[in-house]
Every structure is written in structure tokens, then in C-alpha cells.
Amino acid sequence: MKYILQKTVQIAKKYPFSVCCIVLVWILSFYPFPEMESLEDVPFVDKWTHIAMYGGTCGVIWTEYVRRHLKLDGGKLFFYAWLLPILMSSTIELLQEYCTTYRSGEWFDLAANSTGVTIAVVYGLLFFYFKK
């Protein structure tokens, strides 16, 4: 248990903005927002929000990683900057569906989240390439 806590603190110190974004995603995912009638005219506003939220979070992860490393570790990046956010998104969607009465889990939300994460991968690779 002590090791896990130390590792968590180490990650939070090394990647503070990424950790803040991840915590913010969890909070926003379970906050009971009221319906916004003014946004009903925007097509797929919910999906665009998901893409922006996950793309932004993973963009921050990539930015912090690239700024602290001279070489890309493809395995770590695949796991921490692509797979783990998608698994987190899946977990959140399931928790929204089965553990709340005011939120619903949707497959299209998961697809939008995955799209945002994948866009961030492209951003991260371009950021690394042009950083040199």
C-alpha cells in the first residue's frame, strides 16, 4: 500500500496537469448537470464535448510526457496515453449506467471519447516530431 501511495505522489509531481485533467474528467462525468435548452440546436453537442474532454486530457498527457522525455517509449505511451484513457472511459460509462440515476452510459459516448483520445495521439506524435 505504501508503494502505491509513493508511486501516485511521484506521478502527480511529474505530471501535475495530467492528473488534474483526469480528476476533472471524473468529476464532470458524475456531476448532475441540468439540461441546457440553449444547446439543443447544436448537432451532437454532447459528443463534441466528449471528444474535446478526452482529446484535451490526452493532449495534456502527451505534452507533459514529450516535454520530460527525449525518447518516446511506445509501449508506455500506448498503455498510458491511449489504452488506459479508453478503459477509464469505459469504466465511467458503465458506472454512469449502473450506479447513478441521473446519468446514462452510452456506446456513442465511448466512441466519442475514443475518438478524442486517438486525435490526441496524432497531436502527440506531431508535437514530438516537431519538437526536435
How should these model regions be labeled?
Residues M1-F108, S114-K132:
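Bulky hydrophobic segments
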